[in-house]
Amino acid sequence: MRSGMNKMTVREIKSTFGRWIAIFAIVALGVGFFSGLRITRPAMVHTTNEYLREHDFYDFRLLSTLGLTEEDAEAFGALDGVKRAVGSVSSDALFSLGGTDSGETAARFLMLMPEMNTPSLTAGRLPQSSDECLLDRKYALPSDIGRKLYIAPDNDADTKDLFAHSEYTVGGLADSPLDLNYERGTTALGSGSVSCFVYIPPEGFEYEVYTEIYVTLDTDAAIYTDAYDAAADAMEPRLSERLTERAALRRDSVLGEAQDA
């Protein structure tokens, strides 16, 4: 009886072989697709984590309306669980690129820091003097290297005073870990959109205080893991408390300087 059933099964398969191959292919495709979906997230998280670690990406960005000082950075860096705290300067400003017909456009100018949020050089070289810069590779072409970038006169006085020079030479092109998306953000300037980022050495800015402090945690935990979330959640209230304390000290300092003037 079983032998006859086996023969019938074999005969059925042979007579409809194409159909069985199609069913097998559909099942194999479904299994492959499901396996791909299951591995996609871990693979993407791993790739992102490795990229951010390679470029020393920050964990917290601290802001204060009165600015932040080097003493503030040291105070945050002294907290247990903090690996590094670095002051930085950034500003949105209108600029024009010499030798092009782009006109004035808005860019986000960033301080080039060797120890945190380091860009990926894609063409040219890093700035070697205070009047050189790195330009967003998604905005410019390699042929733009060597051209002058002019700070537009239409910027307000405070913005223009933030720059040590009125023009900078494009030394290279780069990607930035601060701008992982294609869009570069919004601004109150120009059309309302940031067209690109521009990295300038610290000496290329004229500043008395930092506009932000970047903090990295002393942990090897990968992003999107429970261990990382726990470390970040534990650190956030401590940073917030220290920021409130430092802001009060900064306010008292500014008021004291105003009274002595």
Model-inferred region functions:
Residues 2-261:
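Membrane transport/envelope proteins' first extracytoplasmic loop
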